[in-house]
Amino acid sequence: MRDYIVRATAYNNKILAIAAFSTQTAQKAKEIHNLTPTTCAALGRALTAVAMMRVMMKGEKDKVTLVIKGDGPIGNIVVVSNYPGIVKGYVGNPTVDLPLSEKGKLDVGKAVGKNGYVTVIKDIGLKEPYVGTVELQTGEIGEDIAYYFYTSEQVPSAVGVGVLVGKEGNVLASGGFIIQLLPNIEEEVVAKVEEALKNISSVTELLRKGYLPEDILNHILGEMGLNILERVDLKYECDCSQERFETAIIALGKEEIKKLIAEGQSVEAVCHFCGKKYLIEESRLKELLRIAEE
């Protein structure tokens, strides 16, 4: 089944709701980066979150990057969505694998760590992108992003993301939701939403039962006039190119390019997001130097 995201509102547009089914997306990330069950769960959660965050943005050319930097062994988690429904990402140490937590679940929180930061970079076409940074709370990713929304954007939010990994290490199911309460919402409605959220043991449990994005939102907001606005296909896709890496070489400046030429070797670049290798020969480096000198 294809991956997709649903965007909806409820209670006369006073509740914004997003839900995602991201199984193939998480599986592709697992295959590209050769992830362990623990790192697959961590990156899969982050990819699901950034995909939902991008769908919440209005401009066609808007971009969002989510960076999670904790003190755990996984290192940095970087995920990007430059287009609606298109995501890519990587983790600093993809080989980390930890024992299950006390609850018998993949220990993403321990892999990420609790000391560190969540940074969200939103590029909406202005001179400078919006950058918001908050401290990590649990390292479980969902709670950390909810804390970001509340602290940095002043929007009370509930965020749930989960990845179910099988015994063979493949992704059985992946998905998540974001529920946001907009200004001037009545207290009794807030209480209803909170009660509905309390009845969810975990996102992975809903996914295990076969819930799709519409089912998840109905489960939480079904009695509050849920209104589905759009469905967006979701996939893992990298937009790297030879041209982009050559632009990065030019940005190093002419002195650095001269050093590369003096070494008399080709330059090999590897994309962090998809592992694709790009080779820039010495003759091409000289051409890039001429461009840098212009």
From Swiss-Prot:
Protein's cellular compartments: Cytoplasm
Molecular-function annotations in GO: protein folding chaperone; unfolded protein binding
Post-translational note: Under oxidizing conditions two disulfide bonds are formed involving the reactive cysteines. Under reducing conditions zinc is bound to the reactive cysteines and the protein is inactive.
Disulfide bridge positions per record: 238-240, 271-274
GO CC, one annotated term: cytoplasm
Recorded family membership: Belongs to the HSP33 family.
Name the record gives this protein: 33 kDa chaperonin
Originating organism: Thermoanaerobacter pseudethanolicus (strain ATCC 33223 / 39E) (Clostridium thermohydrosulfuricum)
